[in-house]
Each structure stands twice: as C-alpha cells, then as structure tokens.
Amino acid sequence: THVKELVEQNHQKYESYGVTAGIYSAGLKLKETQHQVTFASIQSAARNLDDFDKPYSLIIIDECHRVNLANPDLSRSSSNEQSQKRAKNITKGSTENKLNADSQELSQQNENKQSNSNQYQQIIKKLMQVNPEVKLLGLTATPYRLGMGWIYKKHYRGFIRSEEKRPFEHCIYELPLRYLIKREYLTEPNVVDATIEHYDFSSLRSNASGEYSPTDMNHLLNKNPRVTQGIIEQVIELGEKRQGIMIFAATVEHAKEVFSYLPANLSALITGAIDNTERDKLIKAFKRKEIKYLVNVSVLTTGFDAPHVDMIAILRPTQSVSLYQQIVGRGLRLSENKKDCLVMDYTGND
C-alpha cells in the first residue's frame, strides 16, 4: 500500500488472527522478507527490488483505485508480456507564500500519485520475473476513477463495465456499503447539507481528476472570510456531544484559517508539509481522544483508522465520487457509544 499507517494497520489486523507476517517499510524502520507474507510500503519495496527475489504467488494492492496499472509505458520482455496475459487482474468489490504552499502541495500530491503508479509497475514486473504465474488482487471500497469510470472490465454477475483497457479484468467479489450499514458492520451516516453557512464553488473549473486549483479556491475563499468563521461556529455547536471530529479543508491556507477558529487545546492541523514525527504524535493524540478536532488537507482521506470519529465536516469541493466516499468513510467505523456519524457538507458536493 502507499502509506505506512495502512501497512501498520493491515499488519496488525492480519496478526490478530494468530498468524505472523513481515513488514517492509522504511517509515516503520522494518525491512523483513523472511516470512511467507510481507506487508510492504510501495515506496520502500520499489527502491529495494533486489530484496524481493523469492517467488511470491499473490500480489495484493490495498486502495487499488489510486493506482493506474494500465500505463502503456510499462515495458516488459516478450516472455513477461505473455505472463502478464496469463496473470489474472482482479479487484474487490492572500500572500504569494501562502499560494505557493498550496500549489506546491498539490503538485507534490500529483507527483506522488504518478510515482506510486510507476513504483507499483516496477514491483509487479520484478515479481513476475521471479514467478510468471503470480496473480494480482486489488482491494478497494471505491472501484472507479473520475475520467475512467470502473477500474475493471467484467463483474462476476455477468455484466460488462467497460470494453476498453482497464487496470483489472474481473471483479470477483463485491460487498456494498448499504449492505454493511444495514447489517450494522458499519455506522449509519447522517448526511446533512448545510443551509445557513456554506461555500459556493460552482464558478470554479475542475481538472480531469475532479479537483480544483488551490489558487482559485483561495481567491474565492478570501472573498468570504465570515463564511468560514460561521461554519466553524456551527461545527463546534453541533459537535458538542461528539467524540471525534474530522474537518477536510480545501487548501493549506484555508486549513490554517479553519484551525484558528477552533479551541487551540483540543485541535490539530495536519498538512502534507508536516514532518512524520509530528504527524504521528498528533494522530496518536487524536486517537487517544486528547484532541477532538482534526483539520487536514488531502492527507487523511484514505485508510485512516480512528473508529471513534463520529462527525465529518466537508469544507472542500470535489467531483470525485471515490474521494467523497473515502472522506465519509473515515466516520463509518464501529466504536463504543457511537450511534451514527454526522456528515456536514458545506460545499454542495453532489
């Protein structure tokens, strides 16, 4: 997977069933390959391909909707191209400085996505060289990408999702959110569109990924400073009896403004610029409920596991259904004394 938090969470859950596995992640200071199963950070694995010289039978990619495995630039020898055809691809169901900070963060996020795709291709190529019969399994709660649609071609119930090239061939199993919520495997979301204070991003143009320019968003947000203050006042009021509140801001500048209106002793701000040590410290404090409000910009949308979160405030626009579901999903984990998750959308996301 793409972040060390997910590597650690997945490893802990796997070993809770009484089995053992290794971890290969520089961020977790472990590089173990002697076990039958290895939970790896894609960045660490791709930088140390020679460490993966044993024949693995299965590659599992968590959050596989993030990865563009259909990249035509991936070069293989003719034997590897034949092996790739045999391998089954399957999936489970302001100031200039402030503007530069946001632009740099967006640029870094885009570079990371492209880099991750290339790194996944590198490790897949390496493992296929060792074992041409290795299989590929993708796991995701959101099997689609904006601009692409479904990331697989065929559903196991017989219908065709796409005739075009896709990262995965078949969906072999699907477990809808509605089913999990109805049977109380997940918490019921209570989604509310804010009617008093809200942002209007309708004049902005999104890119192919459904995201908006930080410069454009900052320009719009700076025209309405009272709106943000009013929104946070409502978040504090509605969240009085809530255990953990996550706030998703539009830009770094916006996140800092949001943070300034929250109780300082109960709040934390996480952006892509924060160092790993401080980030880990703040996340642990939030999970221990020492911090009630956690403001972030595009860094805690995937795989972040804090079951006590029972309120989500969305202050960023997106046209990506996948991203929206990932954001809401941060509040759907079951937890003690948690009856539902209040989701406040202040941006009019459809």
Q: Where does each model-flagged region fall?
A:
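Conserved segment of the helicase C-terminal RecA-like domain
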Residues: 331-350
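Conserved helicase ATPase core of P-loop NTP-dependent helicases/translocases
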Residues: 31, 268-296
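Conserved helix/coil segment N-terminal to the catalytic DExD/H
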Residues: 28-58, 69
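Conserved SF2 helicase motif VI
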Residues: 320-336
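A short beta-strand element within the Helicase C-terminal
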Residues: 295, 302-317, 341-345
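Conserved interdomain linker/interface between the two RecA-like ATPase lobes of SF2 helicase motors
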Residues: 169-245
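Conserved Walker A/P-loop ATP-binding site and its immediately adjacent core
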Residues: 1-13
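Post-DEXD/H (motif II) to motif III coupling segment of the RecA-like Helicase ATP-binding lobe
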Residues: 75-76, 80-83, 110-188
